[in-house]
């Protein structure tokens, strides 16, 4: 189980924290030292350092929420893992269940909530403006995990034409992956886990332990490393966060086993080493051509699930770590304007211990962040106010650089 792991790593940190041992600390490697050095030296961008967050509670008493996709008007389509239901959460805090048409019952009938499995990721076709939206869902069934497509009608709060577009993804009570997201190229990316069998991650014929790239019809997307395969990258243990920065660079968060959790920059066809390598700088990984993470944490401090990537940072919602990690993107927009990929600043934590387990994070339309807590999933402790539980909640964060 990813966030009930024992053991604390002694981390040997490369480059920025080279040579430090003894106390568990996050580590950082910058793949763009020129951009990093120039941004850090100038001191011109206050977002290169830590930020603080003002927090508002938008909605509460959500039953085991897992994924969320943004709709126009700062509304969010949220999946409930165990109930296999969908709801639209409005900025006012109103929560409307999606219970019209035949789709919701079909979704319940074919979803199996088993441990970490159930109704997981959700994505909305980015070109849709409503009231009809094409939505994509990742669910655990009796035999496999699958990606589904359906039509969402916000006027009638209905779901219809539920269709399986990709199946055969290994399933288990643990390590199901589940995050799905549209990339800037217009294709759908699917994060899968090794389903408790590490060999899946290194098997090119298995869809487990991979990041997949498909068309909206579920076919391998044009330009994939193997034209006949949906596999985009491999060697993953359990990816649950996907995002892209303004330079088009792709990021993924990944659960480690008992040493190190990871933030990776994803390249097509690359192998990220699981189960041979966990974390950075291992000679076996270097010799085998595995890719190192760009940032890593002891598992006690992270267990990263969803991520959000903005112009100024990568944000990781952490379960066992009960905090929101921020990795600054040094120089942000100015680095991109100069044709550089921003480097990485020192990771720092927000919301540490304040709201418990954090499952997902999304960027809003006005620079704010939205964060889903996850204390009702059987591993957390729901918060009680006035004698009744208030978890789980959708939080809105306003961010300000620390002067």
Each PLM stretch: what is its role?
Residues 1-8:
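Bacterial N-terminal signal peptides that target proteins for export
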Residues 8-14:
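Sec-dependent N-terminal signal peptides
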């Amino acid at each position: 189980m990813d966030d009930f792991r024992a053991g604390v790593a002694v981390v040997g940190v490369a480059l920025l924290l080279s040579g430090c041992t003894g106390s568990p600390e996050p580590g950082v490697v910058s793949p763009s030292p020129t951009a990093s050095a120039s941004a850090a030296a100038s001191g011109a961008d206050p977002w290169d350092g830590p930020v603080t967050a003002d927090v508002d509670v938008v909605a509460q008493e959500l039953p085991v929420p897992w994924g969320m996709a943004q709709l126009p008007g700062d509304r969010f389509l949220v999946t409930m893992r165990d109930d296999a239901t969908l709801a639209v959460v409005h900025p006012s805090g109103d929560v409307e269940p999606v219970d019209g048409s035949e789709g919701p019952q079909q979704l319940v009938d074919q979803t199996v909530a088993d441990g970490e499995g159930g109704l997981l990721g959700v994505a909305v076709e980015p070109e849709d403006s409503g009231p009809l939206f094409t939505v994509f869902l990742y669910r655990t069934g009796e035999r496999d995990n699958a990606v589904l497509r359906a039509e969402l009608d916000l006027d009638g709060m209905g779901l219809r034409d539920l269709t399986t577009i990709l199946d055969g993804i290994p399933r288990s009570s643990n390590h199901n992956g589940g995050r799905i997201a549209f990339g800037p190229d217009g294709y759908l990316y699917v994060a899968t886990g090794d389903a408790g069998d590490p060999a899946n991650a290194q098997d090119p014929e298995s869809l487990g332990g991979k990041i997949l790239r498909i068309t909206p019809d579920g076919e391998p997307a044009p330009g994939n490393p193997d034209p006949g395969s949906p596999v985009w990258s491999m060697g993953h243990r359990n990816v649950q966060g996907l995002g892209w920065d303004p330079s088009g660079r792709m990021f993924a968060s990944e659960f480690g086993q008992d040493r190190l959790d990871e933030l990776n920059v994803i390249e097509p066809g690359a192998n990220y080493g699981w189960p041979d390598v966990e974390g950075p700088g291992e000679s076996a990984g270097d010799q085998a051509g595995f890719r190192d993470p760009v940032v890593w944490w002891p598992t006690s401090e992270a267990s990263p699930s969803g991520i959000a990537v903005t112009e100024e940072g990568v944000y990781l919602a952490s379960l066992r770590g009960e905090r929101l990690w921020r990795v600054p993107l040094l120089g942000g927009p100015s680095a991109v304007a100069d044709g550089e990929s921003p480097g990485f600043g020192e990771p720092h934590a927000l919301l540490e211990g304040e709201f418990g387990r954090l499952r997902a994070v999304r960027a809003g339309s006005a620079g704010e962040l939205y964060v889903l807590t996850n204390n009702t999933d059987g591993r957390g402790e729901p918060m009680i106010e006035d004698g009744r539980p208030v978890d789980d909640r959708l939080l809105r964060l306003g961010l300000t650089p620390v002067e």
